[in-house]
Amino acid sequence: MNAVTFLTRTRRPGRIGLTDILSWVWLIGGTLAVLIPVVWAAMSSLKPEAEITRFPPSLLPRAAVQVEVPGYDRPLSLWTVTIDGMEREMAMVRRVGIKAQMVDPANPGPPVSVDTREMSPVQKLTIATQNFTDPLTQFNFLTFLKNSVFVTVVATVLTLIVNAMAAFALSKYRFRGEKAIFVLIISTLMIPLTVVMVPAYLVIVGVGLVDNLWGVIIPTVATPTGVFLLRQYMLTIPDELIEAARVDAASEFRIFWRIILPLTAPALAVLAIFSVLWRWNDFLWPLIVLSSRENFTLQVGLNAFQGEFSVQWHYILAMTFLSLAPVTVVFLFLQRYITTGIAGTGMK
């Protein structure tokens, strides 16, 4: 079945019913609700700073045309004005209220007063590449990016190892209090982050990891979601495989490394995707732990573009769009594991 046939199929072959129309409206509306903000942010990241706040806004990145006029020490913006019913292109010298002083750029003479309601800016398609180059060269954005990659990769690897070990013990070993421990781990999902944030910070202070990337990584390694997801998947692995390995004198670690982990690959891929999204987008905990600019992660570094009296939206939008690229690539490469991994765990 090709994509067109799949998208245009109906509940009753050859007939379009009300439910089909409602389904299409719902799906199209949901798709637009997701795509429009992303497309708007992408287009706005290419606009010059002045164009981002211009009203009425435009989707395409445009900028006012600037012209050099003899007798003026700076370029003047070009406008289309209506004078005596005729449209002309003139350069604006200054603007006071609803009146603007305009001159002819080709033959400058005394400024002419024009009503601002009778003029519109001359614009051209412009891509503001400085929105991307300035943060990379002037604001240590590459350092923020490197720190985020380090935190994300290391935290994800440790999360997979620690959660897989805990899930292996809870799924394949029988001991007193096994279910109680599992329930206790799952119950931590109901505890808000703000409740444990202060105790976690005091622990980080006690071990001397404040303003250290390891202070961001270590407290986030063990996750109840990861333990639950991997345990549920490991329960589907036959115990006979483990017993056969023990008969062949395989150690518990070898069983875990050579048998359990390969068979749990779909669930590990799902947890890896979740972990990358969590670590890459984490803002509050790195903001609390880190204080030196050279240790900032990407999300904390983006906050530096927001001052007390001004916000550099052109830089924020450009760097936000750029920061979406790594997690998008990870998701595209691992998305085929999501359905099989979650289906195997029984997770809703």
Region locations from a protein language model:
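A structural signal for multi-pass alpha-helical bundles of membrane permease subunits
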Residues: 4, 11, 20-348
